[in-house]
Amino acid sequence: MSLRALRILISAALLSGAFALAQTQSAPPAQTWPAVDGTVVLNNFRFGTGESLPQLKLHYLTLGTPHRNAAGHTDNAVLLLHGTGGDAHSLLNPLFSNVLFGPGALLDIKKYYLILPDDIGHGQSSKPSDGLHMKFPAYDYDDMVRSQRMMLDEMKIDHLRLILGTSMGCMQTFVWGETYTGFADALAPFACLPVPLAGRNRMMRYMSIEAIKNDPAWMGGEYTSEPKQGLHNANEMIFIMGSGPLQMQKLAPTREQAEKYLDDHLALADSRTDANDLIYYVNASRNYNPDPHLESITTPVLWINSADDFINPPELGIAEREVKRMPNARFILIPISDATRGHGTHTVAAVWKDYLADFMRETEPKP
């Protein structure tokens, strides 16, 4: 693979989601999956702030066919949740989908019914850039999870075999486990911690938000063209948050290569990002806090982080402490290696698929 092709490949992976970053030196060719588009409209959706929207549109993709057991309940539905700034299509990344969705794979679409939503504020779902700008309701992860559950109700899905969430979706998976106990057979949160976002994590998010708000061109969110400097500075911070040190050093071993790669990546990121949308989805984590009620998560949990995750650094020791509070949870810390990709390891399914295979066998419902 040429260096130019390598850079294009990694840029595409990085841009699959702002924090949902998957860096790679090589990847299988993308497959064309028979994804079916769907949309539900939730009327008079009320947010945790008390704000409401007359109509909240939620877009999603599905793969496979739903199946119902003898009691009439869905028994093969899998909910896959994307990261901050991503969308349903980001989980069609070949590093993820080629490993998991094909014939005989762990989430073979001939066996499972995969549901990939665009979260509030993302993709083709309702978001600030649709027109409300900073008057859009200030959604948070609780709102997102509640809307996901309402979407499933509209789809007539009354049970899930698995919820697998990456990054933001990882945090939402913990919220699911507390809020809708028993709705899923198994929970797989990848690349997060079940505690409030504070310390360096919140500082970096706050810096990204303030970079935009402090740009005079932002105009309180009523800009007619993107606030370029503020948006650029925000994307710089987000890039560093999701990067992995080993792969960045391999990719850009000289000063010239490092600067060119960063310039190329940011030019693409800036062209694809709306400033108001970024403010909202980065700030959606502000109220996240499953910590007080972790003991209520009795569903089996497979929780995986990687040692080179800059957003969730293992030296904090939080995961090892918190996993003990969930009665059926297992935490795995994947050591840094040539295979890991920083925070984006959550999308590189080859790294953790064997753990998921064991977990799926262990949680297979008994007849």
What are these regions (language model features)?
Residues 23-77, 88-89, 367:
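Catalytic-loop region of hydrolases
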Residues 61-130, 318:
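N-terminal cap/lid subdomain of alpha/beta-hydrolase-fold enzymes
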Residues 142-162:
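Conserved acidic catalytic loop of the alpha/beta-hydrolase fold
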Residues 159-201:
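Conserved hydrolase catalytic core segment
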Residues 183-268:
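Alpha/beta-hydrolase-fold enzymes
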Residues 297, 303-305:
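Short beta-strand/loop motif that positions the catalytic acidic residue
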Residues 310-317:
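Conserved alpha/beta-hydrolase "acid-adjacent" motif
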Residues 328-367:
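Catalytic active-site module of serine/aspartate enzymes centered on a nucleophile-bearing elbow/loop
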